[in-house]
Regions:
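Catalytic domains of carbohydrate-active enzymes that cleave complex glycans
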Residues: 222-224, 231, 622-624, 630, ...
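Extended, loop-rich substrate-binding clefts of extracytoplasmic carbohydrate-active enzymes
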Residues: 54-112, 136-138, 197-207, 213, ...
């Protein structure tokens, strides 16, 4: 039965002989104070210590604590025990009951925390627990403070605001001047990663993320962790329940400084040093006592043979027997195991103590596929919506047939994948692929130049988006194809894109893809492309506004070794944008204020060029023009003259908070007065979005549709008014988004939802945002956490590299064209011939309920989406033919 005690309803402070802590039940048990009694300074930063939570914050479904109760228990005779209990309400946590116990042993300078989560609800929950500590190790947080931990890449001493998969189970903040440290130690079987907040001199916080668990009704999850405080160290190189340690190498000595949180007399340390080449140095044993407030120095004779990373391994013995460390937090061996670096090290990778950092890793999937080739090497076709993982294994079905068929409209690009994997025991090298012309037998052809072959590079994801899903390598970067190997333990995709120019005659086109490899006879894959007898709109029906910071893109281009001028790079972006039917704001935004604004507009028109002027679906007018009414009028007149006013807008504000709404309304009114033909708009989201009735355009976050405001948005869309929406780091699954580790269907279904809801525009904040210091080819994670938000195009020394997601987005824009042409033909046929035999079939095809029943419950099966697209495409052909008779 649950322990009973004295209920606390106000701030409470408890202390041992070495530390004190203060908390309040209304603050969810967060420690507002934590101090060494020998020092008056509070180690808790502004955000407090031991803030606990689950998952990722949502502005739509906030997590709440219910029935909060704090008690002082007297079940342990020699120490105070605080127990906090509460019930949870929110996404993935409803029905959870939380119990947290904090114990202060009298002769220790740390607090032991036992955190237990019980599912008292009726549904299983995906529980992603975390603990956050905002630390102020000295009198004030400043630039000298050190936040340290051990990642898979070794010691981290200068973190930013980012995640680190944990190779060891501790994190520490130290003031090297005052030599005070506050550190936390977690169960290494539970700790997945550490998120650090050291983006400026005023914050030093870390957040421990535990391995998420599926918690069934009636089941519990529990962990134990410790928060300790010590003095005497200028940094921390290792920490455990009982102590923190600093390692120094100088003058032929390796010195271990140990600051303890407990009292352990008559200890003997048996230590060794391990080099990367597995050379081992056994160090002479040292004897000492440890107790809180006392700094122990153990000096060993050892000089490094060279610069590099070394491991320090040690066992403590007491009375000749091992003195096991970290009994509470569950160290795998009860000893000391850490890394230190001498000079410059090229290899600092550190194997984790446990498999926890890899607990969410992708698992091989068995793919039932008909093989194109089934010999030493297996080759098969994959949908462009199936993100092929390197560990995926084909299970051949039936007899191999070297035939691939696709269908596409005139003016459309259609992709598919050729997947390669050697049979067990085989290795195939120097695989080369070429494509020939596709001919229709009547003198018409799709030339080989319209068939693009690209390799697919993978980007590693160590933290899943929103802590939901799996980790591992995800296919995304598309590069010009070079020869490649096929191995028995890895599947390799090749991305094939066929484009039918708008003037391509309808019909069936046939040709071959040739595959050559060392030690194998040449292979031919027969490719059939059916060109449907209708043409996509030259200017897409779906309006898009995707952000691009050309200055940042140019700097990134230079960083990867590019030599293009800014104008040449802009042309590369324009080419891929037009090929993918997307409008990039960085290319189509009108000039900023200028003394000769007419001249600036003329230069802008020349830079953009006639193709983009004709095909772009949006043109942004800079908000800063509002201070220059004459320039606004000139821009407005220019838009009218070029017949582009229906595509013009001005972004007045981005997701303004409620206190700013009055000012934003004034700005909207000013724009409508100055330039009635330029639509002012404001992006908005959350449970209280900014939705003024007289605003020309609404730009809402996608998840607003699932709130009470969704009814008003849908009403406005049904009236044919201008409604756009956007995604960014939100929404999470099960919604659609453009994130790296979302499935292809989850990337593409957004366009079908856009059509079904009557929304006519999609906005996206950036296509090539890279955080400072980040290598986009290795890591696309932000602190949300999400992977790939704001990056759809990769930098290249030759210009721009498309992503697999960029291709899927193009297909989604084309889907919207299909649906637009389908609806137009159906409406015209209904008016011309209400009893036409095609109309019942068209009505069935128009029913998208199975494909998109709502914003979250759509099937993830690529076949269902692709079959619906083909069904609609064929009906467009038939209905247009019927209308032409």
């Amino acid at each position: 039965s649950a322990a009973q005690g004295v209920v606390v309803d106000e701030e409470i402070e408890i202390q041992s002989n070495h530390v004190s802590l203060g908390t309040h039940p209304a603050e969810g048990g967060v420690l507002e104070s934590f101090s060494l009694l020998a020092s008056p300074d509070n180690l808790a930063g502004p955000g407090g210590l031991l803030e606990e939570g689950f998952g990722v914050f949502s502005p739509y479904l906030p997590n709440r604590r219910m029935n909060v109760q704090m008690e002082v228990l007297d079940e342990v005779a020699d120490r105070p025990v605080l127990q906090l209990t509460y019930d949870c309400e929110g996404p993935n946590i409803s029905g959870l009951h939380v119990t947290r116990r904090m114990e202060l042993a009298p002769e220790e300078s740390s607090v032991k925390v036992t955190w237990t989560v019980e599912n008292r609800g009726k549904e299983r929950q995906w529980v992603a627990p975390w603990v956050r500590c905002d630390v102020s190790a000295g009198a004030a947080t400043d630039a000298q403070d050190r936040l340290e931990l051990m990642s898979l890449d070794g010691k981290v001493s200068k973190p930013g605001r980012k995640y680190y998969p944990a190779s060891r189970n501790w994190a520490a903040v130290t003031d090297p001047t005052e030599k005070r440290s506050c550190y936390a130690v977690f169960n290494p079987d539970h700790l997945h990663a550490l998120l650090t907040f050291r983006g400026n001199d005023q914050e030093s916080a870390f957040q421990a993320h535990f391995v998420p668990v599926v918690l069934h009704p009636g089941k519990t999850w529990s962990t134990v962790y410790r928060l300790g405080a010590v003095a005497g160290l200028s940094r921390v190189d290792f920490a455990t329940d009982e102590m923190a340690m600093q390692l120094d190498v100088e003058d032929g000595k390796l010195r271990a400084l140990m600051a303890s949180t407990v009292q352990l007399p008559q200890l003997e340390i048996h230590a060794s040093v391990l080099a990367k080449n597995n050379r081992v140095w056994k160090l002479d044993p040292k004897k000492f006592d440890i107790l809180p407030g006392k700094l122990v120095r153990a000096s060993f004779d050892w000089a490094p043979p060279s610069d590099g990373a070394y491991e320090f391994l040690a066992e403590l013995r007491q009375g000749g027997k091992p003195a096991t460390l970290a009994r509470d937090t569950g160290s795998p061996h009860g000893g000391i195991d850490t890394q230190f670096v001498v000079g410059k090290a090229t290899d600092t990778k550190l194997e984790p103590w446990t498999g926890a950092p890899y607990a969410l890793e992708q698992q091989p999937r068995v793919l039932e596929r008909t093989m194109l080739v089934d010999d030493k090497m297996r080759v098969w076709k994959e949908s462009p919506l199936h993100k092929l993982l390197q560990g995926d294994v084909p299970d051949p079905q039936g007899t191999a047939r070297p035939e691939v068929s696709i269908s596409l409209a005139k003016g459309e690009a259609e992709s598919f994948q050729l997947a390669f994997r050697a049979k067990p025991g085989e290795e195939i090298f120097d695989i080369g692929i070429t494509a020939g012309n596709l001919d229709n037998g009547n003198g018409g052809s799709i030339p080989a130049s319209q068939i693009q072959l690209r390799s697919v590079d993978y980007v590693d994801s160590r933290i899943p988006s929103h802590y939901e899903g799996v980790t591992g390598k995800w296919p995304d970067v598309l590069r010009p194809l070079k020869s490649f190997p096929a191995l028995a333990n890895q599947s390799v995709p090749v991305w094939v894109t066929v484009t039918a120019p708008a003037d391509t005659p309808a019909g069936t086109y046939r040709g071959t893809i040739q595959i050559a490899a060392s030690g194998m006879d040449p292979i031919e894959i027969y490719l059939t492309a059916e060109v449907l007898n209708f043409t996509l709109l030259e200017r897409p029906a779906l309006r898009t506004d995707f952000g691009l910071d050309m200055e940042a893109a140019f700097q990134l281009h230079r960083k990867v070794g590019g030599v293009l001028s800014k104008e040449q790079l802009a042309q590369r972006f324009a080419e891929t944008a037009m090929a993918h039917r997307i409008t990039l704001r960085g290319l189509t935004q009108l000039p900023p204020p200028a003394n000769d604004y007419a001249g600036a507009l003329g230069k802008f028109e020349k830079q953009v060029g006639p193709d983009l002027l004709r095909r772009a679906t949006s043109f942004s007018v800079p908000q800063e023009l509002a201070a220059y009414p004459d320039m606004v009028k000139r821009a407005s007149l220019w838009m009218d003259t070029k017949r582009m006013a229906d595509r013009a807008f001005v972004q007045v504000a981005d997701e303004p908070e409620q206190p700013a709404w009055t000012k934003v309304l004034e700005q909207l009114t000013a724009w409508r007065t100055m330039a009635p033909n330029i639509a002012p708009r404001v992006s908005t989201g959350g449970l209280q979005p900014f939705l003024p009735i007289d605003q020309n355009t609404w730009l809402i976050h996608a998840q607003v549709l699932d709130t009470s405001n969704g009814v008003e948005v849908l009403k406005r869309a049904s009236e044919g008014k201008d409604v756009w929406w956007f995604v960014n780091h939100q929404p999470p699954r099960p919604y659609a988004n453009f994130l790296l580790d979302f499935s292809g269907v989850e990337n593409r279904i957004l366009f079908w939802q856009t059509w079904a809801l009557g929304i006519n525009g999609i906005s996206y904040w950036d296509v090539q945002y890279v955080e400072p210091g980040m290598d986009p080819f290795k890591n696309l994670l932000d602190i949300t956490p999400v992977n790939g938000d704001g990056l759809l195009l990769y930098p290249s020394k030759d210009g721009v590299l498309d992503s697999l997601r960029w291709e899927i987005i193009r297909d989604g824009v084309e889907d919207y064209d299909y649906l637009t042409l389908f609806a137009k033909a159906r409406k015209e046929l209904q008016a011309k011939s209400p009893a036409h035999a095609l109309l019942p079939r068209a009505a069935t095809a128009a029913n998208l309920e199975r494909l998109i029943p709502n914003l979250v419950a759509f099937p993830r099966d690529p076949d269902l989406l692709e079959n619906k697209r083909l069904e609609i495409g064929r009906l467009i052909v038939e209905m247009q033919a019927a209308l032409s008779k």
